[in-house]
Amino acid sequence: MSQEASVDGRFGVASSPTIEEAAGLLEKLLDGSSMVVVAGVCSSEYEGRGASVSTEGDKLLIVKPGGAVILHGPRGFRPLNWQPSTSHTEVATADGLLTLKFYRRTPREVLKIACGSIWYIAWVRFPEEGAFWMYMTEDDLRKAVALHPRELLGEDIRFFAEEKRTPSGKADLYGVDERGNIVIVEVKRVRADESAVRQLEGYVRDYPTQAKVRGILVAPDISDAARRLLESRGLEFRRVDLKKAYSLLKPGRGRSVLDFL
């Protein structure tokens, strides 16, 4: 078996493993933390929502973090078999075959895959799940927040500056709330992480006043670590609905795919 992996172990590939080598590697990889791709000559049996069998042939197996399983043949875009989640996985070898069994508890489903040869096994570990948005750019989101703070942030804020330069960088929005407090807003179009919190903290620290300054991080989601850091720094988080922000910013637009969601 030829095996290559990154120094930190986040991704790698094993080429032409024996059945025993493939089993040993998959027992380590199928722990729910890696995206695993297996290519080889395999057959499958499924029982659950219905029942199906695919005979031995070229197959591509994808196992995602969290247990989603997808089995593809060489043609078309529809999978031969799939399961949305897995409760338990078994890896075994017998009679020259590598056997993988993926069990789902509720509703009960079992997907069994038997491979006579493996061409390669590839894997990658994702430390943080990203997000895919098609609604708007970050500039659009910042404009929507500036124009519609009541609808998106839940309070009236009068903004008087955008992308104001500070020693820590450009702060997205500066404003004043209903009580006269200075408000600094950092906008993120994707899930906010700890670096976004530190950005906002720097902007608040840089503001030249002894009065109270509120720092608000605006994003569609926030990681647990970022939320803990945010709260420890006395900052605030507002969850924003991107679809709502888009509709507020584009009230006169023609019909788009969003109208059918």
Curated annotation (Swiss-Prot):
> What is the gene name?
nucS
In short, the EC number is 3.1.-.-
Localization of this protein = Cytoplasm
Major enzyme class: hydrolase
Alphabetized NCBIfam families for the sequence: PRK04247.1 (NF003270)
State where it is primarily located.
Answer: cytoplasm
**Keyword set includes Nuclease:** yes
Q: Which UniProt keywords apply?
A: Cytoplasm, DNA-binding, Endonuclease, Hydrolase, Nuclease
The UniProt function text for this chain reads:
Cleaves both 3' and 5' ssDNA extremities of branched DNA structures.
Which GO terms of the molecular function aspect are on file? Answer: DNA binding; single-stranded DNA endodeoxyribonuclease activity
InterPro entries to which the protein is assigned, alphabetical: Endonuclease_NucS, NucS_C, NucS_N, NucS_N_sf, tRNA_endonuc-like_dom_sf
The organism's taxonomic lineage, starting at the top: Archaea, Thermoproteota, Thermoprotei, Desulfurococcales, Desulfurococcaceae
The protein's name: Endonuclease NucS
Q: Which family does it belong to?
A: Belongs to the NucS endonuclease family.
Q: Which residues form a coiled coil?
A: none
What CDD domains does the database record attribute to this sequence? NucS-like
> What's any one GO cellular component for it?
cytoplasm
